[in-house]
Amino acid sequence: DLCIGRDDSAIKASNSGFSIFNFEIEVVPNITDLVEENILVEEGECVPEVRKLLRTISDVTSFNYQQYEIEHAPCDRNILVTAGAGTGKTYSMVSRIAFLCNKTADAVVDIVGDIAMITFTKDAAQNMKVRLKKMFMNYFILTSNEKYMHLIEDMSQIQISTIHKFAISLLQRDCMRMGLAYDSQVSSETYNRKELYHNYLNLFLSEKSEENPDFAQQMTLPTYRLEELLIEFCDKLYDRSIDIKKLSSKSFGEATSILPYFNELVDEVIIKAENDYAESLKASNLIGLRECMIQINDLVTSNKLMKQGHEYKYVFVDEFQDTDDIQIETITGLQHLFGEQCKLFIVGDLKQSIYRFRGASLSAFDKAIQVDGKDFWTFYSLNRNYRTDKRLLDKFHDVFTQMGLRSLIPYEEESDRLSSQIIKEYSDGNLICKMESHLKDKDAFYDDFFEKLESELNELNELCQKEKLSKEEKTIAILVRYNWHIRNIVKEAEKKGLLIKVTEGGDLY
């Protein structure tokens, strides 16, 4: 519930509001100019005049009407939320689930059977479970209602996982259709696969050498490197959920002059090795991790996935901009399989689409909407940033505006521009510091880099003496473009006695 009105009692609030657990009070300047009597808004239901009032209050306090609107969105429609970085999308998703569990009519009773959530990494899935558990714990402390203790217990069983793990959980329930036993397991083993590539490539090269004794001398790269490239090529297709076993060499067009026998390698090495590997997994009662999305998509599109036990009412998908075409097709197909009661809640930001090398595209939202049409969707946005200095956001806006004008990214100022009330202690000149150095002169580059890093560390230590900082505020992040940059920086840091913690992203399974 949300109440608006006057209270002349001696409530003391710092800044513009006060909060404890899930209870919040916002102090609205000159509220008597906005409202003449107390107003109660229950479960987000209110007339247009009150919605206008809520937007006004949102503009002058920390109350976020965008989040409130998403939390109480209609339950009979698909929801699409475009959420910029640091705008509280996780909070909004958690609040939405809380609303679904607490609303007066048709509330979620069986959270394990009614709600599923798909995240992009294992770390994100774990973070979501922790946030939900904490929220329900707060509810229990406030109300002493045993309902929330049961919800806390359900957190160990709720389906919150990466899309790969979600696909695997569905496949394991339906493994008999794939010729596997009920106790099938997932495998990410690669040794046997490499052995198959090695054997088929050696056989191919041997046959070529018999046809042409000079064939080995005419090869432009070592055999071991050719073997690695063939596996990498196949993996790139799997990353885009493309099953090479169903293709033929004709699908790849004319071979280049650099590797004129490439199409033969596809037929004689890659496809044969992958078919043998798939058969070996099946014989061992295993599901290949790389192929799980292809297998679940095949079952969904052919309408062969068993519906029994799959009756989710709400499916949440985080970081939707990073899904590829097959994943989108699978998610929307699963929604129809789960039944008419199932509604999607997808969240993402096309500006953060960084997995296009895996098949993600800037049209991810459009492709999801096109399945049933716009009439089945309600659209929301989040653009109040809680993380970044306002001055930086203004600079980013200038960059995004130019990218939008060039059609590099979709960007509309009204809906996409991020706002913030945060002003850090840095001067305007120190918000972005440019260090000019040429990577070809490695010694000079690393000297300059670590000199700057030590300078920032000293400033951070001085700041820690003046005020208490969180773990995140005391952390310096180093972002690189390639993984080999990480190894080089860590190696140079060790020489200088600096410890750098390496994080290369969360696992997909």
Name each model feature, range by range.
Residues 80-82, 116, 186, 257-265, ...:
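A ubiquitous short alpha-helical element
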Residues 85, 182-184, 213-220, 243-253, ...:
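Short coil/turn segments at secondary-structure boundaries
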Residues 113-219, 363-367, 394:
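Conserved P-loop NTPase-based nucleic-acid remodeling module centered on helicase motor cores
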Residues 158-168, 222-239, 296, 478-488:
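Core structural elements
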Residues 164-167, 193-197, 266-314, 326-330, ...:
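Conserved helicase/translocase P-loop NTPase motor core
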